């Protein structure tokens, strides 16, 4: 899947789950399961409930995503 195929959305982290998974509520109101991207994991970026994040969604599965950015 190329970079052009992903859907980027903004959301808020609701809760932290095991294995670096997070429950994220998108601006549209949908709740998805998201994991941290490799760059955030490598640089030890902490993500806590209440943080605003940017999530990439695959057009094939809109219930799972990848957190690519944490807003300051």
Swiss-Prot record:
<dbReference type="GO" id="GO:0005829">
    <property type="term" value="C:cytosol"/>
</dbReference>
<keyword id="KW-0694">RNA-binding</keyword>
<dbReference type="InterPro" id="IPR012340">
    <property type="entry name" value="NA-bd_OB-fold"/>
</dbReference>
<dbReference type="GO" id="GO:0003743">
    <property type="term" value="F:translation initiation factor activity"/>
</dbReference>
<dbReference type="InterPro" id="IPR006196">
    <property type="entry name" value="RNA-binding_domain_S1_IF1"/>
</dbReference>
<keyword id="KW-0963">Cytoplasm</keyword>
<dbReference type="InterPro" id="IPR004368">
    <property type="entry name" value="TIF_IF1"/>
</dbReference>
<keyword id="KW-0648">Protein biosynthesis</keyword>
<comment type="function">
    <text>One of the essential components for the initiation of protein synthesis. Stabilizes the binding of IF-2 and IF-3 on the 30S subunit to which N-formylmethionyl-tRNA(fMet) subsequently binds. Helps modulate mRNA selection, yielding the 30S pre-initiation complex (PIC). Upon addition of the 50S ribosomal subunit IF-1, IF-2 and IF-3 are released leaving the mature 70S translation initiation complex.</text>
</comment>
<protein>
    <recommendedName>
        <fullName>Translation initiation factor IF-1</fullName>
    </recommendedName>
</protein>
<dbReference type="InterPro" id="IPR003029">
    <property type="entry name" value="S1_domain"/>
</dbReference>
<comment type="subunit">
    <text>Component of the 30S ribosomal translation pre-initiation complex which assembles on the 30S ribosome in the order IF-2 and IF-3, IF-1 and N-formylmethionyl-tRNA(fMet); mRNA recruitment can occur at any time during PIC assembly.</text>
</comment>
<dbReference type="Pfam" id="PF01176">
    <property type="entry name" value="eIF-1a"/>
</dbReference>
<keyword id="KW-0699">rRNA-binding</keyword>
<dbReference type="GO" id="GO:0043022">
    <property type="term" value="F:ribosome binding"/>
</dbReference>
<feature type="domain" description="S1-like">
    <location>
        <begin position="1"/>
        <end position="72"/>
    </location>
</feature>
<comment type="similarity">
    <text>Belongs to the IF-1 family.</text>
</comment>
<keyword id="KW-0396">Initiation factor</keyword>
<dbReference type="GO" id="GO:0019843">
    <property type="term" value="F:rRNA binding"/>
</dbReference>
């Amino acid at each position: 899947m190329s970079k052009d195929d992903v859907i980027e959305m903004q959301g808020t982290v609701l809760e932290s789950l095991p294995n670096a998974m997070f429950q994220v509520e998108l601006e549209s109101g949908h709740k998805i399961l998201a994991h941290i991207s490799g760059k955030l994991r490598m640089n030890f970026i902490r993500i806590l409930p209440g943080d605003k994040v940017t999530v990439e969604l695959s057009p094939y599965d809109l219930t799972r995503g990848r957190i690519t950015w944490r807003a300051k």
